[in-house]
């Protein structure tokens, strides 16, 4: 039997981290078994589904590189199929037309609640022999079995049982002729030969209804696995107040897809004590039996740690392809400066996100209008004039422009003037970067370049001279 899973989001908003984790688990399970992964867009909610949301879901899946083997399928393009199946069920007696008015149903609901009963349809039209005109508005309901129970072996939670007496007759077609969500899902899973349905625990109550419909259609019943919810670090349901919840917001905030995937796979699943997983290792080790039943707590600090790890361990050339987008957002022209892969190596150790790198690198490519006020006040003082003049001349004299030779020039300046390295390095750092902090000074100066470094030192010397003039 070929394993076939699906990810079936409703396009009413962005792809959130909970949905992304479900997609990842479904994708990994299919890949682990050499199976296929289907993308299905469940857009039956015509009022809330939007093209923008569909695009956002696709963007998120593509950014995470969770490529699908089939699809995307759209439920709105399959309405004829759904209605044909409903018509067949009406003929077979496994579905029936319901003419009850909204007013009657509301009164029934209020009466049941007043009596402390669970609100449910009472089956009036199921047993009715009244004649109705062909054009009289009606819905179609599934004739749910009235005895026995539905038992399914959830691959994460174990056996789950529902009494059929607790399940009312589900509406499968509305008065406007459109099929309902729970019915469309059943026909889709049947037609697409889905063998394993991996989805959120909020779908557990839908499962017995869907199984009963599948059995009424003499269709195979897939295996089900329901993943627990994701909470914030305070134990409450994850929401925007806990930070970003959209997958693409994490892209915008400077996270690598490898970091988010690694974090999400561990958010409810484990393989021993291992924390870092390549994509290949995720595929090899993933199993539903190792997925926890308990809710997971989202910890942004842990995700940030993983992101920093991947920035510094993935090939710099690859990280640079993701950095490019952030550089463009900052409107930085990188033609006159270090290659982005070199920039990753320069700033990756200090910066934990790609956005931080992009916001920290402008001085490598563009001239800054002024020095950081605090750094200049502390380090661009008259006492720094001689160290800057000497190191400028030594840098200008370098023939083979390497970081090692830059380091020698800085060290030689300190030795010649018989001062500590800080007396040379700190004013030099402010001079060439405009700020008081940077990566190691030798590699920073090397990346900025000889002529640009010399020009900036001269600018710093002019700043010191002007400062002296104001003091006198």
Curated annotation (Swiss-Prot):
It is found in: Cytoplasm. Keywords: Aminoacyl-tRNA synthetase, ATP-binding, Cytoplasm, Ligase, Metal-binding, Nucleotide-binding, Protein biosynthesis, Zinc. Zn(2+) binds at residues 98, 100, 125, 127. A motif ('KMSKS' region) lies at residues 237-241. Its cofactor is Zn(2+). GO terms for molecular function: ATP binding; glutamate-tRNA ligase activity; tRNA binding; zinc ion binding. SUPFAM superfamilies: An anticodon-binding domain of class I aminoacyl-tRNA synthetases (SSF48163), Nucleotidylyl transferase (SSF52374). Its main location: cytoplasm. ATP binds at residue 240. Catalyzes the attachment of glutamate to tRNA(Glu) in a two-step reaction: glutamate is first activated by ATP to form Glu-AMP and then transferred to the acceptor end of tRNA(Glu). Monomer. Belongs to the class-I aminoacyl-tRNA synthetase family. Glutamate--tRNA ligase type 1 subfamily. HAMAP family: Glu_tRNA_synth_type1 (MF_00022). This is Glutamate--tRNA ligase. It comes from Klebsiella pneumoniae (strain 342). The lineage of its organism: Bacteria, Pseudomonadati, Pseudomonadota, Gammaproteobacteria, Enterobacterales.
């Amino acid at each position: 039997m070929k394993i076939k899973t699906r990810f079936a989001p409703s396009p009413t908003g962005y792809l959130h981290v909970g949905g992304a984790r479900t997609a990842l688990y479904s994708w990994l399970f299919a890949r682990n078994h050499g199976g296929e992964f289907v993308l299905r867009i469940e857009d039956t909610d015509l009022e809330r589904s939007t093209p923008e949301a569909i695009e956002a879901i696709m963007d998120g899946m593509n950014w995470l590189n969770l490529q699908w083997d089939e699809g995307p399928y759209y439920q709105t393009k399959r309405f004829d199929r759904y209605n044909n199946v409903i018509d067949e069920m009406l003929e077979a007696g496994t579905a029936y037309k319901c003419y009850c008015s909204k007013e009657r149903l509301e009164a029934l609901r209020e009466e049941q609640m007043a009596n402390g009963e669970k609100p449910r349809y009472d089956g009036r039209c199921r047993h009715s022999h009244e004649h109705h005109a062909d054009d009289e508005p009606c819905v179609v309901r599934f004739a749910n079995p009235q005895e026995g129970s539905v038992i399914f072996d959830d691959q994460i939670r174990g056996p789950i049982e529902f009494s059929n007496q607790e399940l009312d007759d589900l509406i499968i077609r509305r008065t406007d002729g459109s099929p309902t969500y729970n019915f469309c899902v059943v026909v889709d899973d049947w037609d697409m030969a889905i063998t394993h349905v991996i989805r959120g625990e909020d779908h557990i109550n839908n499962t017995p209804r869907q199984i009963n419909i599948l059995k009424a259609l003499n269709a195979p019943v897939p295996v089900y696995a329901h993943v627990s919810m994701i909470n914030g670090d305070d134990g409450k349901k994850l929401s925007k107040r806990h930070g970003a919840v959209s997958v693409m917001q994490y892209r915008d905030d400077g996270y690598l897809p490898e970091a988010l995937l690694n974090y999400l796979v561990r958010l409810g699943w484990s393989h021993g004590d291992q924390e870092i997983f390549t994509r290949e290792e995720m595929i090899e080790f993933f199993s539903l039996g190792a997925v926890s039943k308990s809710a997971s707590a989202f910890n942004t600090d842990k995700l940030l740690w993983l992101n920093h790890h991947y920035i510094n361990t993935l090939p710099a050339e690859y990280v640079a392809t993701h950095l490019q987008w952030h550089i463009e957002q900052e409107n930085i022209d990188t033609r006159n400066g270090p290659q982005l892969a070199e920039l990753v190596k320069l700033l990756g150790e200090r910066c934990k996100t790609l956005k931080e790198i992009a916001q920290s690198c402008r001085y490598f490519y563009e001239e800054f209008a002024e020095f950081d006020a605090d750094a200049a006040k502390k380090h661009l003082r008259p006492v720094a004039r001689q160290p800057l003049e000497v190191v400028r001349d030594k840098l200008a004299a370098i023939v083979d422009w390497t970081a090692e030779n830059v380091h020698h020039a800085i060290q030689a300046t300190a030795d010649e003037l018989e001062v500590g390295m800080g007396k040379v390095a700190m004013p030099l750092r402010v001079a060439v970067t405009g700020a008081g902090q940077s990566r190691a000074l030798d590699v920073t100066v090397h990346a900025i370049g000889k002529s640009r470094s010399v020009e900036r030192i001269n600018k710093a010397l002019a700043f010191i001279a002007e400062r002296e003039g104001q003091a006198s």
